[in-house]
């Protein structure tokens, strides 16, 4: 089954558009890790003004994560992954239910923001742009102290609906094939 943290800590992301700062707290609400927080990005450059509903329900566009409070689970120090998953770095955890499901999107995670800058909608943490940095080692130590159970995301993005004219039509599932993360030896799937 899934490894949901029990009685764990929390992650708080605050920012504007699609970037900001993240702080971690332990189960007692005490800040752990860098007291100034960690820089984060979500989505591709140029997606800062995408409204909440589109962030929630438009997979495959590289939009930022929608604002909200979600479960954090299935943390994995998987080491380097190949090809399209290289950008995850050496560790990741799912955000949302199941395999990182938020609205109509899946594969939503928190991971190191490996260069180039930006993610497909995950929360990418700025720890130097490559795996194995001192910043990353400190972050992972703080992660284990926090044992985060929830993440609260607030990019202050505009609310409002979708402008149907400029959007391509979607199939019932145009996301990358989903794979269950609770199979032994499975790798995370790229976000959509």
Where are the predicted features?
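Secretion-targeting segments and adjacent low-complexity export tracts
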Residues: 1-8, 181, 187-192
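Gly/Pro-biased beta-strand-loop elements
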Residues: 1-108
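Exported/periplasmic cell-wall-interacting domains
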Residues: 76-188
């Amino acid at each position: 089954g899934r490894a949901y943290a029990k009685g764990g800590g929390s992650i708080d992301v605050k920012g504007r558009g699609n970037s900001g700062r993240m702080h971690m707290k332990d189960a007692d609400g005490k800040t752990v890790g860098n007291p100034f927080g960690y820089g984060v990005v979500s989505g591709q450059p140029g997606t800062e003004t995408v409204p909440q509903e589109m962030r929630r329900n438009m997979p495959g566009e590289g939009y930022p994560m929608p604002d909200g409070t979600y479960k954090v689970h299935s943390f994995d120090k998987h080491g380097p992954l190949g090809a399209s998953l290289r950008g995850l770095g050496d560790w990741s955890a799912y955000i949302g239910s199941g395999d990182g499901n938020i609205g109509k999107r899946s594969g939503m995670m928190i991971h190191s923001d490996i260069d180039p800058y930006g993610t497909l909608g995950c929360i990418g943490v700025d720890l130097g742009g490559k795996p194995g940095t001192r910043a990353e080692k400190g972050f992972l130590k703080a992660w284990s102290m926090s044992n985060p159970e929830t993440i609260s995301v607030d990019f202050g993005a505009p609310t409002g609906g979708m402008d149907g004219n400029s959007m391509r039509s979607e199939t019932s599932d145009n996301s990358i094939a989903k794979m269950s993360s609770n199979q032994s030896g499975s790798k995370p799937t790229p976000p959509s």
